UniProtKB/Swiss-Prot annotation:
Pfam families: KGG
Recorded superkingdom: Bacteria
Biased composition (Basic and acidic residues): 11-23, 36-45
InterPro entries, per the entry: Stress-induced_KGG_rpt
Native source species: Pseudomonas aeruginosa (strain ATCC 15692 / DSM 22644 / CIP 104116 / JCM 14847 / LMG 12228 / 1C / PRS 101 / PAO1)
Induction of the gene: Highly expressed in biofilms.
Protein name: Putative virulence-regulating protein PA2146
Its biological purpose: May be involved in the regulation of the production of pyocyanine, one of the major virulence factors secreted by P.aeruginosa, and other virulence factors.
Annotated disulfide bonds: none
Family: Belongs to the con-10 family.
Amino acid sequence: MAQHQGGKGNFAEDPKRASEAGKKGGQASGGNFKNDPQRASEAGKKGGQRSHGGN
């Protein structure tokens, strides 16, 4: 595992900046079901179909 090497880009030193980066990442993600309920429904159906026939 890489050692921690501080610096200006270190989120541990600036929690507010880390929070903002997390929000931006979530907004940019294209797989957000909140904005597409139909897609979420289809994903749920697919998951249910695959979870029952494994044995």
